[in-house]
A protein has these predicted regions:
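Long, basic N-terminal domains or extensions that often function
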Residues: 1-232
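Extended amphipathic alpha-helical scaffolds
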Residues: 1-45, 229-369, 554-568, 576, ...
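Conserved phosphate/anionic-ligand binding catalytic regions in large, soluble enzymes, centered on
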Residues: 27-29, 122-141, 328-351, 433-453, ...
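Glycine-rich, flexible beta-strand/loop modules in the N-terminal catalytic cores of phosphate-handling
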Residues: 25-109, 115-117, 121-122, 188, ...
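Mobile "lid/hinge" segments at catalytic clefts and subdomain interfaces of large enzymes
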Residues: 140-257, 448-547
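Long, charged amphipathic helices and adjacent flexible linkers at domain junctions
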Residues: 231-241, 532-559, 607-627
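Single-stranded RNA-binding regions, centering on S1/OB-family and related RNA-binding modules
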Residues: 552-556, 563-699
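Flexible, glycine/charged-enriched surface loops at secondary-structure junctions
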Residues: 103-109, 144-146, 213-231, 263, ...
Length: 699
């Protein structure tokens, strides 16, 4: 017999079935939220993985197309690699869970959330996030949970808890907050310039809901939870730390890590490591964990410098931003480019414009999101950190960073009506020493403006870090963290926005949560830094969007036709529209409402295509004059094509003012002629005349 538990959550019923399915996993919960069903499982290996110095956690959010009554596309007709949305959801599930596992745990842990049914009223991300927490809490896997997750929307100034898919589409805020019993442990947000005070209010609205969910989870764990298993700790032996300090005193390690140059610091630490290897040459068991021991020693040293001495590794003040530089148009012939440098972090972003037909098509579980006109892609090559690795395409980190920058910029993009382009920005990481995702937001803003994209306002991003002591009041918030402060600190709090509000947040931490005081201070600190970057760097580099797109960017003409004429313009099996495209070299996109976009580089070709479409879509009246081409000659006259798929007949008597015996004496195939419309003949064909064209129209 299985056990079932239910609670009301945001006006819908959340039901959790324990012991019903997947009983061979360490923990499993079949989650029902409305008609949305997600199977969440937690499984751990029986033995630790050898030779690693990290906790091997993997999270898989699996979207099954049968959940929305679809058969997957493609040749194989089955689910393939994870979609971008699935990867991003996996990361959101991972981030609040990871800090709650023991730091010295080395057993492989896999969390799988399989979406089996989707109710548009109940977002599957919610039961997936809660299911992972419940499955892990009731398992025998060591875990300091529970944690709970809630989403918040903002419509007409009112907060919506766990908004439906339709509500998310119209919301000014898409916020996800995870909490432990007392503290916030993860924040992810996309927002339409939401003020800082409103954002904090929304975060703690979600935190309140999370406390009710945690009580619900506690009840399940009390009745169904297994005893946590003991595990082999992989912590560095204390006697090794003591021996290291004898050879390399704390003052010497401080000197090694204190530098504003990343490579100098890394070389200093490498020399310390070599010194220790020589000293411990006869202690194989210590050599096996020496790398982790040196890492931990660096960490303790840096944290002590910051927390006790208020001294950062590169000598900056606690609120000081690294040196900034910005420039645009650094790459010729592309549609727009910009480079943003912050200390030893450097990003170049290139913008490409294309017709709306080239927008990315999405085939996922969200019926309200079928395409994406703005794409931001982030690349992180190994040379940016001085390493050698083969390039194997974007990983989860690159996809996550790209999505964060994309989310930050979407609120300021012009509408399709204002700017009928698909837009792609690609951020290339030239150099990395922390906060590359935020630098890519700054570079993308300038690149879009340089490309002539009329964004409403510039956007900048900055990240704050944190070092905590033994009590909640013992902490230091750091503005603009570099790589070392990210690795050894407790928080990476990224915030992007305009002068008027926040457009994106992503908060990752390595501790068990943040107090409200820290959250408020971090948000205030990022606002201060963001204002500085916008005013002193971005707006001085490029004051606003260029008045038009660049010389090498495609131009777009828009016209409106009667929707009932769309079939005439397209033609049978696309023959007419393809002929226009072949003749002019332009790209054409037509919406169901009759909005036609003509895209090309050559203005003359675009105008020619526009004329053709207007002629095809027009109901002809007597007296209209056209220019066409002779496509057929008969004894009784000639047929003239005046637009692809559109033709009319010129009777032999209407060719010349003088009488002629043979059409061929005057016209040949391919001749370009000007004709005037006489109406329709008895057979319903367009009837033209060449001889009746006014003299001024012939010129």
């Amino acid at each position: 017999m299985y056990k079932s538990y239910s609670m009301e959550l945001a006006g819908r019923t959340l039901t959790v079935d324990i012991g019903r399915v997947a009983k061979q996993a360490n923990g499993a919960a079949l989650m029902h939220y409305g008609d949305t069903t997600v199977l969440a499982t937690a499984t751990a290996s029986k033995e630790p993985r050898e030779g690693i110095d990290f906790f091997p956690l993997s999270v898989e959010y699996e979207e099954k197309m049968y959940a929305v009554g679809k058969i997957p596309g493609g040749f194989n007709k089955r689910e393939g690699k994870a979609s971008e949305h699935a990867i991003l959801t996996s990361r959101v599930i991972d981030r609040p869970m990871r800090p709650l596992f023991p730091k010295d745990y080395r057993n492989d842990v896999t969390l799988v959330d399989m979406v089996m049914s989707v109710d548009p009223e109940c977002n599957p991300e919610i039961p997936a996030m809660l299911g992972s927490s419940i499955a892990t809490c009731i398992s025998d896997i060591p875990f300091d949970g529970p944690c709970a997750t809630t989403q918040v929307g903002l419509i007409d100034g009112e907060f919506i808890i766990n908004p439906t898919l339709a509500q998310k589409d119209m919301s000014d805020l898409q916020l996800t907050v995870a909490s432990t019993r007392d503290k916030v442990i993860m924040i992810e947000a996309g927002a339409n310039e939401v003020p800082e005070a409103k954002m904090i209010e929304a975060i703690y609205k979600a935190h309140e809901v999370n406390q009710e969910i945690i009580k619900f989870i506690d009840k399940i764990v009390a009745e169904c939870g297994k005893e946590k298993h003991t595990y082999q700790s992989c912590a560095v032996p204390e006697e090794l730390f003591a021996a290291i300090k004898e050879i390399v005193p704390p003052e010497e390690m401080e000197v090694a890590v204190f530098s504003d140059d990343k490579q100098t610091r890394e070389n200093n630490v490498a020399q310390v490591t070599e010194k220790l290897k020589e000293a411990f040459a006869d202690k194989e068991e210590w050599l096996a964990v020496l790398g982790e021991a040196v890492y931990q020693y660096q960490k303790k040293t840096v944290r002590k410098m910051i927390l006790k001495d208020h001294k950062r590794p590169d000598g900056r003040a606690i609120k000081q931003i690294r040196p900034l530089a910005a420039e645009v148009d650094i790459i010729p012939r592309v549609h727009g480019s910009a480079m943003f440098t912050r200390g030893q972090t450097q990003i170049c972003t290139v913008t490409t414009l294309a017709p709306l037909a080239e927008a990315q098509r999405l085939d996922g579980l969200d019926e309200f999101e079928t395409s994406k006109r703005y794409m931001h892609h982030y690349n992180f090559p190994s040379y940016s950190v001085g390493e050698t690795k083969p390039s194997r395409g974007p990983g989860r980190r690159e996809i996550g960073h790209g999505a964060l920058a994309e989310r930050a910029l979407v609120p300021v993009l012009p509408s399709e009506e204002e700017f009928p382009y698909a837009i792609r920005t690609v951020s290339e990481t030239f150099e990395s020493n922390g906060s590359t995702s935020q630098a890519s937001i700054c570079a993308s803003t300038m690149s879009l403006e340089a490309a002539g994209v009329p964004i409403k306002k510039p956007v900048a991003g900055i990240s704050c870090g944190l070092v905590t002591g033994d009590t909640d009041d013992d902490y230091i918030v750091l503005t603009d963290i570099q790589g070392l402060e990210d690795f050894f600190g407790d928080m990476d709090f990224k915030v992007a926005g305009t002068h008027d509000g926040i457009t994106a947040i992503q908060m990752d931490i390595k501790i068990h949560g943040l107090t409200r005081q820290i959250v408020e201070e971090a948000i205030a600190r990022t606002k201060e830094a963001r204002e500085y970057i916008l005013t002193e760097v971005i707006e001085k580099c490029i004051p606003g969007p260029r008045p038009s797109v660049g010389a090498y960017a495609p131009k777009i003409i828009q016209i409106q036709i009667d929707p009932q004429k769309i079939g005439d313009v397209v033609g049978q099996r696309g023959k007419t529209i393809n002929t226009i495209i072949e003749r002019t070299g332009v790209k054409i996109d037509i919406t169901d409402e009759g909005a036609v976009s003509i895209c090309g580089v050559d203005a003359k070709s675009m105008e020619e295509a526009k004329k053709m479409i207007e002629i095809i879509a027009t109901d002809f009246e007597q007296g209209q004059i056209f220019t066409g081409r002779v496509i057929s000659i008969k004894e009784f006259g000639a047929f003239v094509e005046f637009a692809p798929g559109k033709e009319g007949m010129v009777h032999i008597s209407k060719i010349c003012k003088e009488r002629i015996n043979r059409v061929e004496d005057v016209l040949t195939l391919g001749d370009k002629v000007t004709v005037i419309c006489l109406g329709k003949d008895k057979m319903g064909r367009m009837s033209f005349s060449i001889k009746d064209v006014p003299e001024e129209a012939r010129k």
